[in-house]
Amino acid sequence: MHRLEPYQLWLGHAGDLAGVRSILDAGICAVVDLALNEPAAHLPRDMIYCRFPLVDGTGNDPWILLSAIRTTANFLKLDVPLLVCCSAGLSRGPAIIAAALSIVTLKTPEDCLRQVSKSVSHDVSPGFWNEVVGVCHSLHEQPPAA
């Protein structure tokens, strides 16, 4: 797991979800799991666990992408200690974190991915990134809910 300062935010991989003790020791209260190809994590009952089964490539339902991005952004806005995981922690996790940060900071997803890459290495799938950016741009174009 890698902490992304200055946020209460960690990026991890599927193996990190097996290490419940390290998650609890870090003070993490919520997990966003993005890997369709991994089994669901077995976490303590009092931990918030949100699973959004995303493919590391193209073909994801926009509503699932939107839900993953908004959920991550809401946890960030509320300053909830959050772990975002995907299989290897290199593609889906960094992309969804960048999209969520773009909502929170009002910066572009590209700028936010550059910010994430200062803390962790990534290898975001181009097809997946294009889908994420498309959903992000549609979010920025929507008027705020009344």
Where do the language-model regions lie?
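C-terminal domain-closing interface element
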Residues: 139-146
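A phosphate-binding catalytic loop at a beta-strand-loop-alpha-helix junction
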Residues: 75, 79-98
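Cysteine-based protein phosphatase catalytic domain of the PTP/DSP
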Residues: 2-81, 102-134
